[in-house]
């Protein structure tokens, strides 16, 4: 598997073969030199310090003309006796130095520089060594010949001072030093500059450009820290391309205009960034694990609750007839569906948290491992690691809690089924209620039998009473309960502004309504009705806090359940017109049901504290009426 993983990518290899070793970009007008390597025409021409092959014929002609001129000059010098004078070493050295300076000036003025020239130092060193050897050779010969000429001159002067030396014995002019042209890749040298166009390679490069507009970057970084292109140490980091480069790459066209920093600096910077992500990831993981444990406990509690309720349902239905067995099966089915839906939500939340925990664990381990690495291993895919660390977001599960009072709990099941069978609902627990006129707000009008209430046309003159509501259009039932189970039904008419429920005895009836609403203790009924139409859905908070009222009602088209500690928007499947209110004093439960379909609406868990609890009614708008069912 490791061998397969290290196999180079053919596409990447093809891209690399189409890149010039001098400019590190795709070939432009590629040419081949004598050793077979290919380069851009402009790059190799600048490297060799001359013009391209097209001007070679003209240069050859100029060289031939110069040779002819030199021969004529030699003949002229020989004829004039110039060679009779011994050559001085300093004269010859001066000529050689001038010639070397001219060649160097021409060479550097030809535009050599830019990318990858540092990698060509060996070319200049070899040429300088060859020139020095040739110069020493010629200077040595000149010195020897000069000595011989001096001896010969002395002998001739002794014989005949007027006799001239034979020009044939004079030193011939030194040949011009030859220049070598070296391949920048294989270092092979050539006596003449020669290259030819490579049309097939040019066509291939055009195809590669269409596939990949820019040369690949990934192959330059390896585990050994050596640039595979230039065999130089990777000591720099390009912040634009986000890759390690060598000093030769820094001078190339690809990176020359980019921001480059030392590799060690960026390694330390990225290490610090990774360390900065470790602690937040650890905290996220701990938070997810805590929520996961909490969800698992809730699932266990829900399962236990389901088992206990199913056992209670089975016990109640065991005493009923065949008809009750059918009802039992139907209710058990609905109950299981309800619990399975809750279990599904809880299980899904636990699974999501488990997935988040696993993901965070993997990412945390990766970040810790990467933060301990150094050099190039740390930088590989570092941006992707940062993105995944930064994109991690804690997704808490949906906040929900199982309703402790299910719509078909055992304390209501028997009475509901008996009522359905006999069209009566547990007469032992059913209450025949009436309204208490001493508690009614002056804007409320009670029916003669005290079973109905609505808004009056105008405010009524009623005697003062300590129990009377003076700040809100409410009325209580005449009967209160301190123990036992009790059930009553209420019929509501109109669609706006009503509430039914229960209130504890120790309520304050005279307080002004706080920020949640306004008082209606004065003014006529019309202004009261207009004011109540602008009220919020819920009961005023000051009223609820001091009265301990638990009620379900509407304002406009929306249903909601309201108490001093709870405010819940409701979405019943059907809009109930007849409510059943079920009070279990000892259990501290107050349940609301659709009396026509026995559908559960809402259940409060309340603390009655040994006080009497009275039925509670509220009317807010004209056209709304409440009637107690016998």
Curated annotation (Swiss-Prot):
This is E3 ubiquitin-protein ligase TRIM41. InterPro entries: B30.2/SPRY, B30.2/SPRY_sf, Butyrophylin_SPRY, ConA-like_dom_sf, PRY, SPRY_dom, TRIM/RBCC, TRIM41_SPRY_PRY. The modification Phosphothreonine is found at residue 85. SMART domains: BBOX (SM00336), PRY (SM00589), RING (SM00184), SPRY (SM00449). Pathway: Protein modification; protein ubiquitination. The keyword Nucleus applies. It comes from the Eukaryota. It comes from Mus musculus (Mouse). Belongs to the TRIM/RBCC family. Disruption phenotype: Deletion mutant impairs the production of inflammatory cytokines and type I interferons in macrophages after infection with both DNA and RNA viruses. Residues 413-630 form the B30.2/SPRY domain. E3 ligase that plays essential roles in innate antiviral response. Directly binds to influenza A virus or vesicular stomatitis virus nucleoproteins and targets them for ubiquitination and proteasomal degradation, thereby limiting viral infections. Activates the innate antiviral response by catalyzing monoubiquitination of CGAS, thereby activating CGAS. Also involved in innate antiviral response by mediating 'Lys-63'-linked polyubiquitylation of BCL10 which in turn hubs NEMO for activation of NF-kappa-B and IRF3 pathways. The modification Phosphoserine is found at residue 447. Interacts with PRKCA. Interacts with NOD2. Interacts with TRIM17; this interaction prevents TRIM41 activity on ZSCAN2. Its EC number is 2.3.2.27. Keywords: Coiled coil, Cytoplasm, Isopeptide bond, Metal-binding, Nucleus, Phosphoprotein, Transferase, Ubl conjugation, Ubl conjugation pathway, Zinc, Zinc-finger. It is found in: Cytoplasm; Nucleus. Residues 51-75, 148-166 have a biased composition (Acidic residues). GO terms for biological process: cellular response to lipopolysaccharide; cellular response to muramyl dipeptide; defense response to virus; positive regulation of type I interferon-mediated signaling pathway; protein monoubiquitination. It catalyses: S-ubiquitinyl-[E2 ubiquitin-conjugating enzyme]-L-cysteine + [acceptor protein]-L-lysine = [E2 ubiquitin-conjugating enzyme]-L-cysteine + N(6)-ubiquitinyl-[acceptor protein]-L-lysine. The keyword Transport does not apply. A zinc finger (RING-type) spans 20-61. Residues 281-374 form a coiled coil.
């Amino acid at each position: 598997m490791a061998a397969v993983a290290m196999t180079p990518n053919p596409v990447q290899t093809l891209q690399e073969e189409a890149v010039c070793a001098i400019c590190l970009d795709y070939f432009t007008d590629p040419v081949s030199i004598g050793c077979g390597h290919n380069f851009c025409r402009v790059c190799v021409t600048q490297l060799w310090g001359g013009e391209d092959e097209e001007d070679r014929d003209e240069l050859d002609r100029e060289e031939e003309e110069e040779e002819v001129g030199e021969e004529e000059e030699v003949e002229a010098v020989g004829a004039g006796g110039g060679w009779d004078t011994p050559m001085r070493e300093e004269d010859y050295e001066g000529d050689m130095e001038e010639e070397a300076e001219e060649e160097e000036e021409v060479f550097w003025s030809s535009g050599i520089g830019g990318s990858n020239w540092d990698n060509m130092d060996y070319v200049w060193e070899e040429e300088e060594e060859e020139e020095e050897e040739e110069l020493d050779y010629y200077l040595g010969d000149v010195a020897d010949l000069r000595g011989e000429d001096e001896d010969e001159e002395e002998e001739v002067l002794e014989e005949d001072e007027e006799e001239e030396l034979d020009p044939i014995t004079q030193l011939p002019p030194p040949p011009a030093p030859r220049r070598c042209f070296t391949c920048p890749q294989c270092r092979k040298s050539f006596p003449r500059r020669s290259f030819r166009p490579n049309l097939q390679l040019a066509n291939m490069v055009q195809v590669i450009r269409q596939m990949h507009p820019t040369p690949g970057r990934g192959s330059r970084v390896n585990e050994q820290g050596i640039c595979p292109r230039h065999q130089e140490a990777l000591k720099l980091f390009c912040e634009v391309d986000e890759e390690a480069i060598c000093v030769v790459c820094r001078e190339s066209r690809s990176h020359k205009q980019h921001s480059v920093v030392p590799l060690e600096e960026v390694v330390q910077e990225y290490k610090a960034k990774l360390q900065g992500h470790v602690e937040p990831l650890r905290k996220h993981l701990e938070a997810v694990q805590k929520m996961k444990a909490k969800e698992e406990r809730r699932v266990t509690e829900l399962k236990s609750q389901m088992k206990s309720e199913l056992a209670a349902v089975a016990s109640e239905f065991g005493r009923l007839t065949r008809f009750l067995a059918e009802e039992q099966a139907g209710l058990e089915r609905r109950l299981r569906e309800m619990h399975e839906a809750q279990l599904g939500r809880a299980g899904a939340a636990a699974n999501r948290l488990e997935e988040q925990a696993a993901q965070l664990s993997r990412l945390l381990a990766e970040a810790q491992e990467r933060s301990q690495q150094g050099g190039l291993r740390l930088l590989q895919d570092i941006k992707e690691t940062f993105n995944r660390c930064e994109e991690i977001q804690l997704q808490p599960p949906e906040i929900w809690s199982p309703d402790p009072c299910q719509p078909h709990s055992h304390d209501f099941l028997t009475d509901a089924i008996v009522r359905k069978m006999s069209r009566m609902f547990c007469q032992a627990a059913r209450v025949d209620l009436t309204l208490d006129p001493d508690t009614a707000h002056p804007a409320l009008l009670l029916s003669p039998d005290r079973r109905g209430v609505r808004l009056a046309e105008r405010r009524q003159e009623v005697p003062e009473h300590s129990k009377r509501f003076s700040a809100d259009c409410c009325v209580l039932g005449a009967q209160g309960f301190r123990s036992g189970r009790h059930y009553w039904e209420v019929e509501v008419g109109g669609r706006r502004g009503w509430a039914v429920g229960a209130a504890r005895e120790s309520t304050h009836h005279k307080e002004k309504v706080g920020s949640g609403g306004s008082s209606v203790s004065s003014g006529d009924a019309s202004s009261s009705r207009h004011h109540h139409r602008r009220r919020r859905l819920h009961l005023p908070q000051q009223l609820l806090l001091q009265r301990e009222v638990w009620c379900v009602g509407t304002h406009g088209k929306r249903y909601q359940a309201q108490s001093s500690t709870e405010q819940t928007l409701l979405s019943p499947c059907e809009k109930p017109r007849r409510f059943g209110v079920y009070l279990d004093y000892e259990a501290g439960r107050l349940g609301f049901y659709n009396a026509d379909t026995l559908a559960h609406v809402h259940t409060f868990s309340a603390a009655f504290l040994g006080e009497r609890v009275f039925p509670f009614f509220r009317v807010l708008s004209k056209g709304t009426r409440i009637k107690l069912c016998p």
